[in-house]
Regions:
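Beta-strand-turn-beta hairpins that frame and shape the catalytic cleft
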Residues: 1-3, 102-113, 183, 234-238
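Acidic, histidine-bearing metal-coordination/catalytic regions of metal-dependent phosphoesterases
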Residues: 1-4, 8-14, 134, 147
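Residue-level marker for buried hydrophobic side chains located in beta-strands
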Residues: 2-4, 33-34, 184, 223
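Core catalytic region of metal-dependent phosphoesterases/phosphodiesterases
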Residues: 5, 11-106, 199, 203-211, ...
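Active-site environment of divalent metal-dependent phosphoester hydrolases
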Residues: 9-14, 39-44, 68-76, 103-104, ...
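Cap/insert and terminal regions of metallo-dependent hydrolase folds
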Residues: 50-53, 173-175, 180-225
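Active-site-proximal loop/helix segment associated with metal-binding centers of metalloenzymes
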Residues: 93, 107-200
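Binuclear metal-dependent phosphoesterase catalytic core
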Residues: 105, 208-216, 227-248
Length: 248
């Protein structure tokens, strides 16, 4: 069995048996995929350990693509392993980060993964710790009602957007399967869907790349998160948030 869900942001209540009773029939061979903003590797220290240990104790394997709210510095410290034909960061034996641009073969189906998204909650700036005016700017923003800002390497990471090497890796791996997969799992959506979701959304290099995938690739379903809703955009594109849906 394979299930997919949306953003967790470090809140894993949905995986408790009373909310996800299907797990009673699952084993570690079965997989639940989070479509970004996993948030389980957030502090990058011992504060993450209890939640990660609890996730490892669940009867299934939990995998996730990255979102725009992840601690990339901490994620990159985990070992890279090969898993079902693609690369993962192994957070725990059965808690895995599905890296960008990979094609995994799971239960006989091909899954293409491309995590990441551009943060839109930074209108008041991205503060840089260690600069002379950091404390002053932070204090001003803390006093401002509904301020939307982030702090570099504490609550925002430039790696939220893929590198050129990751785009190249994605195209290379898609070419190996003739741009034909069964499922696409991303955090944000292709440009035409992203612009439809919210008038404040803007195209960016990642949404444009995903638009290229949408137009070039052959796939059955595309599941994504990021926009905090649960609904079918059309017969092939599914936006997820709290829901956990079975795909295989």
């Amino acid at each position: 069995m394979i299930f997919v869900t949306g953003d967790c942001h470090g809140n894993f209540e949905r995986f408790k048996p009373k909310y996800f009773p299907e797990q009673a029939q699952m084993t570690k061979r079965d997989i639940v995929i989070c479509a970004g903003d996993f948030g389980g590797v957030w502090f990058g220290d011992g504060r993450d350990e209890a939640a990660l240990d609890w996730l490892e104790s669940l009867p299934f394997t939990l995998a996730f693509v990255c979102g725009n709210h992840e601690n990339y510095d901490a994620l990159e410290r985990y070992p890279v392993k090969d898993w079902h034909g693609g690369k993962v960061h192994r957070i725990r034996s059965h808690v895995l980060h599905l890296m960008r641009g990979q094609v995994f073969e799971l239960e006989g189906y091909h899954f293409f993964t491309m995590g990441g998204a551009k943060s839109h909650d930074t209108e008041d700036g991205i503060l840089e710790p260690g600069t002379p005016d950091f404390e002053r700017k932070l204090l001003m923003l803390q006093r401002k009602p509904r301020a939307r800002y982030r702090i570099n390497h504490i609550s925002w990471w430039a790696q939220e957007m893929p590198s050129e090497e990751e785009y190249a890796e994605a195209r290379k791996n898609l070419a190996k399967v003739d741009w034909a997969v069964d499922y696409v799992i991303t955090h944000c959506a292709p440009t035409n869907i992203a612009l439809m979701e919210n008038r404040h959304n803007e195209a960016d290099p990642l949404t444009d790349f995903l638009q290229e995938v949408k137009e070039r690739a052959h796939y059955h379903y595309w599941l994504f998160g990021h926009y905090h809703d649960n609904r079918a955009i059309d017969e092939k594109h599914i936006l997820l948030w709290e829901q956990i849906v079975q795909v295989i």
